């Protein structure tokens, strides 16, 4: 007679074992109709699963995050159902959920086209609209293998052979004549799976190993209702318009080429944005009492072995040899900063020492993962390392957190997800050290009243970390900032200070990055602003243009005034209509266009327009200069006339 405890604390007693769905039915028909699955004692279970003992139960519906993930997983099975009907010889591999959707890897003797995707999507819709029940069946390992051997599914048999114990009882899910194997849970009926779209096909090796056969990966998205689906597709369209690679080319910011994969060729305008970011961060370094240093970008293998990077990070390091010595190009700045700390005797009175660097780092990322500025091999980190005592950890981490929010707020990012990443399986240092490090970060987060998510096993090999992920205007998350405690590296590199009792102690090291990779951050803000950089960041802040040749001299005079005031300005004296010039510079996202005609010359003024098409009227040149300088000094996000 199980007693079921519901989320509100109420209890229901049943005479016999009861299914998740039956409990929902006992509460109400509306809830039963909405039930996708249940969370029994915290574990997700199918709606048909029986509850034999006293348990807690939460009903999962399409309104829950778990419910949406289950819908997506079931849509992957629906795709399998459809492709098996249209291409009976296809061999099914794996079909998991991913962010915003799902995919299925299939082995088919022909390449799928967009037309095939359209046909598949249509068949999926036809099947889903029949609202058939999904039937779950627990079988023995041998029964499952016999089932897939009979159905000619070698990949399913391989999963059973390699991943599932022979004494296990895997679950088979029956979609009419189609059978798939999965941990589940899945929807009880296909009425929940009406809102999806197949997105693209890509290649994927079986098991992710290039030695194995290349399969075709069909990507799809799925949502709880039509409004959510349409909203997502609209966001994708907007994201395509904001793609930093497209905007970067249109604005002549940078380029990349095959001879230097994952490396950026910065053009003048892109490098201007880069340097403005550096300048801004430098002002904050001064405000938060950091010293700026510069270390070598290549060091001997011996040092990297001491730090543990060679053993734990070697696959991602570029190496070279000279005079019978092996060197590694640095993938991160921390070992170099310890070398600087080690020069000269340090006292506890000297701590904390906050050491920052715009460090040029290189990582040998897989070529398939490279993506514009977002994933590169050569990048610049706004990196810092704080050497402190254990007693100073919380105050220093708190200062880092304050700096993170200060800088992100300047760019308009206020929705920030905070995550605490704990010890990974592959790590250095004793468990006691990890206990102290993880607790220190957790205490600082609690002290700052920050809600955070724990990411088990996602820390670096030398310490746990706090991650800050920015949520942009398209509701995407970008992980940028990190604060990382490290009790191991200073000791490995013999860093020490003289404590108050005159004993030598090893300092705690806090790794801190805010923008992360500056290249990646430029990619993020390019998409966030759609290339409409605020005036302080814009490569060109104003263009001064004439109407006829008679105003050319006045234009040059105005340009000199703005340039002498420290503003980035260009003249456009081409023999083109002023409307043509305005349109061209609008497409280049120049914040302000200053038009000089005979009337403006007579009054000593300029006519001001913004890139958004707002006519701001005429301004005295000096007045406009002061207004623009104020926008730049204040790092304001909006232009004149934008509220």
Swiss-Prot record:
Gene Ontology biological-process entries: threonyl-tRNA aminoacylation
EC number: 6.1.1.3
Domain TGS: 1-61
UniProt enzyme class: ligase
Residues the entry annotates as binding Zn(2+): 334, 385, 511
Cysteine pairs bridged by disulfides in the record: none
Reactions mediated catalytically: tRNA(Thr) + L-threonine + ATP = L-threonyl-tRNA(Thr) + AMP + diphosphate + H(+)
Subcellular location: Cytoplasm
CDD domains, sorted: TGS_ThrRS, ThrRS_anticodon, ThrRS_core
Entry annotated with the keyword Cell inner membrane: no
InterPro entries assigned: aa-tRNA-synt_IIb, aa-tRNA-synth_II, aa-tRNA-synth_II/BPL/LPL, Anticodon-bd, Anticodon-bd_dom_sf, Beta-grasp_dom_sf, TGS, TGS-like
Region (Catalytic): 243-534
A cellular-component GO term for this protein: cytosol
GO molecular function: ATP binding; metal ion binding; threonine-tRNA ligase activity; tRNA binding
Any Pfam family matching the protein: tRNA_SAD
Primary site of residence: cytoplasm
Cofactor note: Binds 1 zinc ion per subunit.
Cofactor: Zn(2+)
UniProt keyword annotations, A-Z: Aminoacyl-tRNA synthetase, ATP-binding, Cytoplasm, Ligase, Metal-binding, Nucleotide-binding, Protein biosynthesis, RNA-binding, tRNA-binding, Zinc
The protein's role, per its UniProt record: Catalyzes the attachment of threonine to tRNA(Thr) in a two-step reaction: L-threonine is first activated by ATP to form Thr-AMP and then transferred to the acceptor end of tRNA(Thr). Also edits incorrectly charged L-seryl-tRNA(Thr).
Quaternary structure and partners: Homodimer.
Family to which this protein belongs: Belongs to the class-II aminoacyl-tRNA synthetase family.
Name of the molecule in the record: Threonine--tRNA ligase
Organism: Actinobacillus succinogenes (strain ATCC 55618 / DSM 22257 / CCUG 43843 / 130Z)
Name of encoding gene: thrS
């Amino acid at each position: 007679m199980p007693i079921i405890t519901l989320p509100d604390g109420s209890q229901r007693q049943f005479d016999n074992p009861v299914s998740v769905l039956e409990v929902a039915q006992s509460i109400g028909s509306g809830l039963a109709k909405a039930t996708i699955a249940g969370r029994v004692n915290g574990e997700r279970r199918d709606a048909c699963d029986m509850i034999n003992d006293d348990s807690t139960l939460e009903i999962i519906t399409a309104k829950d995050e778990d419910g949406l993930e289950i819908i997506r997983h079931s849509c992957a099975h629906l795709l399998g159902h459809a492709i098996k009907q249209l291409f009976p010889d296809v061999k099914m591999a794996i079909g998991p959920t991913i962010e915003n959707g799902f995919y299925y890897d299939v082995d088919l003797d022909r390449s799928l086209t967009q037309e095939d995707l359209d046909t598949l999507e249509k068949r999926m819709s036809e099947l889903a609209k029949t609202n058939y029940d999904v039937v779950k069946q627990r079988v023995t390992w041998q029964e499952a293998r016999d089932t897939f051997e009979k159905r000619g599914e070698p990949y399913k048999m391989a999963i059973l052979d390699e991943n599932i114990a022979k004494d296990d009882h895997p679950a088979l899910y029956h979609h009419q004549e189609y059978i798939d194997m999965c941990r589940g849970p899945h929807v009880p009926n296909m009425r929940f799976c009406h809102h999806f779209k197949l997105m693209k096909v890509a290649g994927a090796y079986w098991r992710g190993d290039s030695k194995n056969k290349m399969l075709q990966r069909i990507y799809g998205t799925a949502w709880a209702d039509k409004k959510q689906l349409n909203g997502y597709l609209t966001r994708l369209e907007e994201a395509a318009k904001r793609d930093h690679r497209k905007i970067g080319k249109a604005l002549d910011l940078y380029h990349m080429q095959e001879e230097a994969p994952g490396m950026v060729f910065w053009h003048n305008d892109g490098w201007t944005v880069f340097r403005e970011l550096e300048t801004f961060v430098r002002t904050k370094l001064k405000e938060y009492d950091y010293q700026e240093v510069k270390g070598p970008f290549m060091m001997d293998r011996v040092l990297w072995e001491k730090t543990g990077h060679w053993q734990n990070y070697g696959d991602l390091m570029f190496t070279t040899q000279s005079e019978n010595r092996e060197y590694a190009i640095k993938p991160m700045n921390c070992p170099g900063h310890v070398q600087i700390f080690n020069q000269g005797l340090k006292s506890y009175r000297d701590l904390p020492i906050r050491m920052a660097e715009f460090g040029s780092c290189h990582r040998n990322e897989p070529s398939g993962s490279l993506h514009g500025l977002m994933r590169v091999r050569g990048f610049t980190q706004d990196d810092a390392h704080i050497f402190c005592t254990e007693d100073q950890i919380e105050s220093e981490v708190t200062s880092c957190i304050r700096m993170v929010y200060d800088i992100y707020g300047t760019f308009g990012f206020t929705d920030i997800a905070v995550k605490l990443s704990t010890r990974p399986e592959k790590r250095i240092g004793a468990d006691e050290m990890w206990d102290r490090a993880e607790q220190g970060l957790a205490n600082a987060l609690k002290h700052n009243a920050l809600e955070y998510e724990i990411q088990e096993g996602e820390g670096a090999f030398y310490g746990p970390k706090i991650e800050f992920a920015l949520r942009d205007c398209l509701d995407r998350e970008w992980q940028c900032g990190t604060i990382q405690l490290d009790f191991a590296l200073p000791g490995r590199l013999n860093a020490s200070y003289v404590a108050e009792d005159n004993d030598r102690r090893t300092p705690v090291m806090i790794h801190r990055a805010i923008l992360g990779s500056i290249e990646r951050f430029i990619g993020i803000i390019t998409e966030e602003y759609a290339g409409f950089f605020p005036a302080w960041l814009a490569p060109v802040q104003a263009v001064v243009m004439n109407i006829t040749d008679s105003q050319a001299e006045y234009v040059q005079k105005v340009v000199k005034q703005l340039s002498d005031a420290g503003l980035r300005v260009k003249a456009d004296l081409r023999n083109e209509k002023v409307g043509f010039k305005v349109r061209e510079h609008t497409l280049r996202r120049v914040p302000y266009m200053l038009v000089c005609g005979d009337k403006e010359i007579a009054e000593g003024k300029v006519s001001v327009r913004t890139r958004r098409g707002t006519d701001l009227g005429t301004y005295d040149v000096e007045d406009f200069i002061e207004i623009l300088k104020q926008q730049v000094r204040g790092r304001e996000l909006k232009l004149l006339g934008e509220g």
